């Protein structure tokens, strides 16, 4: 197994200093990964999104025609398809339309209400903390740099990300044919296309970065909208209740699941997020 050089060595990650000691107290356990966790990090940097990658393999057999079929089912529903649904798409849509056993709709609804109560503070945190921190994170910004998304389309990308966030945080914004649900799956689809494109590019260095848009980087992006936001609102003097924070993380756990992140990287508590960020 390749160990991308961007990942610090296991020994280096065991270093103890004031920062790690502080996090150990906050997390109530060592923030440094044990060896099993470290190996999982190595693997995550080399793993994509198996479910949607299968769809992309099928789409590329007839890019224009197959993409039209995928988008029709995604945005209109499978009942609108006149011909039999291809096996690859049937398997994928069966998977994403069947909600995970752990999903609690009440917590989703509570998280949406909490998000709305934050009002304009959402914009400050997402713009000045979550997105800016994300753009400073090398694993996140390398695909953006190589595809030109930061240089040529930064404003468009910011607008699209904001629109997506607004859509998913609407009441029932994650129901099957809602704009939030469909745009989330479409982003997942685009991620897979970019991953396929960059994997073939001479400009992408697997030995340094792992594969493009890998599981770890997707999980870090999800944390920028969940754990980092909770830190940001506290910095503004807004202290959520334990239940509000729990529901908020649950909401983003489901969004991350829809986005193709494996469940082992979807946090259920803030300390889990802090350890993963470390």
Predicted regions and their residues:
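Mature, function-bearing regions of proteins
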Residues: 1-222, 226-278
């Amino acid at each position: 197994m390749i160990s991308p050089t961007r990942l610090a060595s296991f020994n280096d990650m065991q270093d103890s200093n004031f920062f790690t000691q502080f996090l150990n107290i906050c997390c109530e356990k060592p923030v440094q990964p044990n060896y099993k966790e470290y190996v999982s990090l190595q693997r995550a940097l080399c793993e994509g999104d198996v479910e949607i990658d299968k769809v992309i393999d099928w789409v590329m057999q007839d890019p224009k025609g197959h993409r039209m079929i995928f988008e029709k089912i995604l945005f209109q529903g499978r009942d609108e398809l006149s011909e039999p649904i291809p096996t690859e798409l049937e398997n994928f849509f069966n998977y994403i339309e069947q909600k995970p056993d752990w999903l609690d709709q009440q917590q989703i609804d509570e998280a949406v209400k909490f998000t709305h109560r934050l009002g304009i503070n959402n914009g400050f945190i997402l713009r000045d903390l979550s997105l800016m921190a994300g753009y400073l994170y090398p694993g996140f910004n390398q695909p953006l740099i190589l595809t030109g998304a930061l240089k040529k389309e930064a404003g468009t990308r910011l607008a699209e990300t904001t629109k997506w966030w607004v859509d998913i945080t609407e009441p029932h914004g994650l129901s099957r044919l809602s704009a939030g649900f469909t745009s989330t799956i479409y982003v997942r689809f685009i991620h897979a296309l970019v991953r396929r494109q960059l994997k073939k590019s001479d400009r992408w260095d697997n030995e340094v970065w792992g594969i493009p848009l890998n599981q770890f980087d997707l999980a870090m992006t999800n944390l920028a909208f969940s754990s980092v936001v909770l830190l940001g609102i506290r910095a503004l003097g807004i202290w959520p209740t334990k239940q509000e924070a729990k529901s908020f993380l649950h909401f983003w756990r489901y969004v991350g699941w829809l986005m193709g992140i494996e469940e082992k990287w979807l946090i259920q508590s803030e300390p889990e997020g802090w350890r993963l960020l470390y």
